[in-house]
Curated annotation (Swiss-Prot):
Pathway: Cell wall biogenesis; peptidoglycan biosynthesis. The modification N6-carboxylysine is found at residue 219. This is UDP-N-acetylmuramoyl-L-alanyl-D-glutamate--2,6-diaminopimelate ligase. Catalyzes the addition of meso-diaminopimelic acid to the nucleotide precursor UDP-N-acetylmuramoyl-L-alanyl-D-glutamate (UMAG) in the biosynthesis of bacterial cell-wall peptidoglycan. It comes from Clostridium perfringens (strain 13 / Type A). Meso-2,6-diaminopimelate binds at residues 381, 405-408, 455, 459. Belongs to the MurCDEF family. MurE subfamily. It catalyses: UDP-N-acetyl-alpha-D-muramoyl-L-alanyl-D-glutamate + meso-2,6-diaminopimelate + ATP = UDP-N-acetyl-alpha-D-muramoyl-L-alanyl-gamma-D-glutamyl-meso-2,6-diaminopimelate + ADP + phosphate + H(+). The keyword Nucleotide-binding applies. Its EC number is 6.3.2.13. GO terms for biological process: cell division; cell wall organization; peptidoglycan biosynthetic process; regulation of cell shape. The gene is murE. It is an enzyme of class 6 (ligase). It is found in: Cytoplasm. The lineage of its organism: Bacteria, Bacillati, Bacillota, Clostridia, Eubacteriales. ATP binds at residues 110-116.
């Protein structure tokens, strides 16, 4: 491809060489460079791509995209831009033929509820006959074909490659979980969203964003790029988003939803039980919906999805069908149901204070005897939420078993000490080994008890200091039942 074509839509300066030169591929990782590639020198938080220019040239890079002043002796084309992250996004889109413009893209942001919402919308669109792609935490999907996900939102190059694969496969809609990292790091730069949904905002990722204001502003970027913004007005930050959209002159149509406050679309006559909820919403007339996942927070997730589908003119019967039939891996997932155990086991991805409170409150409401929770906190992540999660776990559970999650580079016991140090409860026990913690919960469970294993959900691995091991909690439960 001609370099000039890749640079379309960018403000740039040719420092050296020729913009009519040919480029084989675009790379932002110097380890992947091949002969004739363009190397985009992305400035990261730990490493700076500009430091690897010499290595990139040795491997065959013929073009450098930089934002710093650089000098090289070789016959290399150098293009200077203001921001190489934004440049990577635009160039990647151009390289793959701008597939984003051939898809209707729906973005979902918020601390919790992104995955559930994405799966609900995908289910609704597929019931309506649309081939749908999904990009998210659990995996990426091209229709029914599953592609493993490395991060919630891929880097811009991989994202546009995925868009191209979707377009080639006949996908019409793409539903995306849009993380605060991806918005802040410009992975989704240049993408215009058909619909942007806000689920909620609670403390998370402050190890990255540093302040809550930064976290909020990162999330807000989605609505600056959405044709239609759908906002949860019951969340304390929902009203802020609506206000900021107006005050900042953002060109987006706004719809609000709620259970408590007055909004454009309010759920009422709610009936909740252990298998899900039924509720009504006044759209063009009063409509009744049901979802087979319990918890008030899943009614909120459903509302955003219903409005999204309604805006897209999806037939009402297909919206209802997609909502009632949706299955979400690792979200309030009942495990070993066919074993007819005297107690129940639920696996859930809850890994934030708000997420843990939601799942435990929901399960507690339908637990006949005791609720036993098993949870920990991730290493190399925001430490402030550790005692918060300990307090929530002990307050809501009859017995809390505090264990390891993904400790990463930290010592598991150091993380556990952060969780339990301020606790003034006597209903918790510590078991560092996560499998043994699950075994302990199952061994102590009595008839009518419910065990909630929180934190990993769909994940099939555990990240330790020196290695990542296979760890699927469904398999662990069955292994324990078989005496392993």
């Amino acid at each position: 491809m001609i370099l000039k074509s890749l640079l379309k839509g960018l403000d740039y300066e040719v420092i050296k060489g020729n913009e009519e030169s040919k480029v084989q591929n675009i790379r932002y990782d110097n380890r992947k460079i091949e002969q004739g590639d363009a190397f985009v020198c992305v400035k990261g938080f730990k490493v700076d791509g500009h430091s690897f220019i010499g290595d990139a040239i040795k491997k065959g890079a013929k073009t450098l995209i930089v934002q710093e002043d650089v000098s090289v002796q070789e016959d290399i084309t150098i293009i200077k831009v203001r921001d190489t992250r934004k440049a990577l996004a635009i160039m990647s889109s151009n390289y793959f033929g701008n597939p984003k413009d051939k898809l209707k893209i729906i973005g979902i942001t918020g601390t919790n509820g992104k995955t559930t919402s994405a799966f609900i919308i995908k289910s609704i669109l597929e019931k309506a006959g649309f081939m749908t792609g999904l990009i998210g935490t659990i995996a990426n999907y091209i229709g029914n074909k599953k592609v493993d996900a490395v991060r919630t939102t891929p880097e811009s190059y991989e994202l546009h490659e995925l868009f191209k694969n979707m377009v080639d496969a006949g996908v019409e809609y793409c539903v995306m979980e849009v993380s605060s990292h991806s918005l802040e790091l410009d992975r989704v730069y240049g993408i215009q969203f058909e619909e942007g949904i806000f689920t909620n905002l609670t403390r998370d990722h402050l190890d990255f964003h540093k302040t809550f204001e930064n976290y909020y502003n990162a999330k807000f970027k989605l609505f600056e790029r959405s044709n239609h913004s759908i906002i949860n007005l019951d969340d304390p930050y929902g009203a802020n988003i609506v206000k900021d959209i107006e005050e900042r002159g953002v060109k987006t149509k706004v719809s609000t939803f709620s259970i408590e406050k007055e909004s454009d679309f309010k759920a009422f006559e709610i009936k909740s039980h252990s298998n899900g909820s039924e509720f009504k919403v006044n759209l063009e007339g009063i409509e009744e919906f049901s979802i087979n996942i319990p918890g008030e927070y899943n009614i909120y997730n459903s509302l955003g999805c219903i409005i999204c589908a309604y805006n897209l003119n999806i037939p009402m019967d297909k919206i209802k069908e997609g909502l009632s039939d949706v299955v979400i891996p690792g979200r309030c997932e009942l495990v070993a149901k066919e074993k007819n155990l005297p107690y129940s086991i639920i696996i859930d991805y809850a890994h934030t204070p708000d997420g843990l409170e939601n799942i435990l409150s929901t399960v507690k409401a339908f637990t006949k005897n005791r609720m036993i929770s098993v949870f920990g906190c991730g290493g190399d992540r925001d430490k402030v939420k550790r005692p918060q999660m300990g307090k929530i776990g002990c307050e809501l559970s009859d017995i809390a078993i505090i264990t390891s999650d993904n400790p990463r580079s930290e010592e598991p016991m150091d993380i556990i000490n952060d969780i339990v140090k301020p606790l003034n409860y006597d209903n918790f026990v510590i078991e560092v080994n996560r499998k043994e913690a699950i075994r302990k919960a199952m061994n102590m469970a009595l008839e009518g008890d419910v065990i909630v294993i929180a934190g990993k959900g769909h994940e099939t691995y555990q990240i330790l200091k020196d290695e990542t091991i296979h760890f699927d909690e469904r398999e662990v439960v069955y292994d324990i039942l078989e005496g392993k």
